[in-house]
Amino acid sequence: MVFMDDLEEIRRRKLMELQRQKELEELQKEEMRRQVEAQKKAILRAILEPEAKERLSRLKLAHPEIAEAVENQLIYLAQAGRIQSKITDKMLVEILKRVQPKKRETRIIRK
């Protein structure tokens, strides 16, 4: 019986250790995600005019996947040194027109 209790205690300790490791990994992943997000915000703040930044944040509320794609593309271009001046609201509108999928126009013809 003592052997079974020891075995149970070892299992319990091992399970607790695994749980601690998993929690630590989750905390590290969350911290890494926060750092990446902070870097993205800093880069976008540096390359976007306030009006363009506001438009992008509104777009993020309505269409997060499109906003994320545009943000990633802008960050990539900035890191590659391909953006020479701040992006204005007008420039961002043009970028968004190119990125958004074309809508099919449905025409109804009545006879």
From Swiss-Prot:
InterPro entries, per database record: DNA_bind_arc, PDCD5-like, PDCD5-like_sf
GO MF term list: DNA binding
Gene3D superfamilies in the record: PDCD5-like (1.10.8.140)
Superkingdom per UniProt: Archaea
Pfam families the UniProt entry points to: dsDNA_bind
UniProtKB keywords: DNA-binding
Gene Ontology cellular component terms for the protein in this record: cytosol
Assigned protein family: Belongs to the PDCD5 family.
Protein name: DNA-binding protein AF_2068
Organism: Archaeoglobus fulgidus (strain ATCC 49558 / DSM 4304 / JCM 9628 / NBRC 100126 / VC-16)
